[in-house]
Design a protein with these regions (language model features):
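Sec-dependent N-terminal signal peptides
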Residues: 4-15
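Acidic, glycine-rich calcium-binding repeat modules characteristic of RTX/beta-roll
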Residues: 36
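Gram-negative (and chloroplast) outer-membrane scaffold detector with strong preference
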Residues: 39-134, 179-182
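Short strand-turn segments of transmembrane beta-barrel domains in outer membranes
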Residues: 26-33
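Boundary at the C-terminal end of the N-terminal hydrophobic targeting segment
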Residues: 17-21
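N-terminal "first-domain core" detector
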Residues: 23-25, 44
Length: 184
């Protein structure tokens, strides 16, 4: 994590890429309330940055009441045309986090996770430097149990394990991504 912060600091504090002027836009911030990203524009088509967030899911199936995930990671954006125009984009994300599942009996199960997403989608860019991005694609979530706090012996931990195994790889992620961004 320390190395990630050092790399991002160097990118953010460095002068513009050769051939660019300081008046050109250099950063992109996007959000969808649960996920926030901050990226440094490398050139017309590429940006690199980090993402973080906290998501809540009301599951209410298979004895699992809800899930809460906290995560942090790095991302790279490539557009077929440009970052400051309407364009198709490819967005790989790599991150780490924790998910806490709460079952119907009040037990909690905490999982450490390593996430890899490869999103593809479309980015609409507006003249006021706002953008809207929609994407979806495959995901891989490698999760391992860190702890459990049992409130009963009903065996709900097996239901949580089954859910974690089902989400290990999804050809199309169960949640499409919709972001609103600002370039500055």
């Amino acid at each position: 994590m320390k190395h990630l912060l050092i790399i991002l600091s160097v990118l953010l504090l460095s002068s513009p890429v050769i051939g660019e002027t300081s008046e050109e836009k250099q950063f992109i911030a996007t959000t969808n309330i649960f996920v926030n990203t901050f990226s440094y524009i490398l050139n017309k088509q590429n940006a690199v940055g980090f993402h973080f967030g906290k998501g809540f899911t009301d599951i209410n199936e298979d004895n699992i009441e809800k899930g809460e995930t906290i995560f942090l990671g790095v991302n790279y954006t490539y557009t077929l045309d440009c970052l400051q125009c309407d364009s198709i984009f490819i967005l790989p994300l790599f991150g780490r986090g924790n998910t806490v599942y709460t079952t119907n009996d009040g037990s909690t199960y905490t999982y450490s996770r390593l996430d890899i997403y490869l999103l593809g989608g479309y980015r609409w860019y507006f003249e006021n430097d706002l953008s809207v991005q929609f994407g979806m694609g495959p995901s891989s979530v490698n999760a391992s149990k860190k702890s459990e706090n049992l409130k009963s012996n009903k065996g709900y931990g097996n239901d949580v394990e089954d859910r974690v195994k089902k989400r290990r790889f999804e050809l199309i992620n169960h949640t499409p991504f919709l972001f609103i961004g600002y370039t500055f």
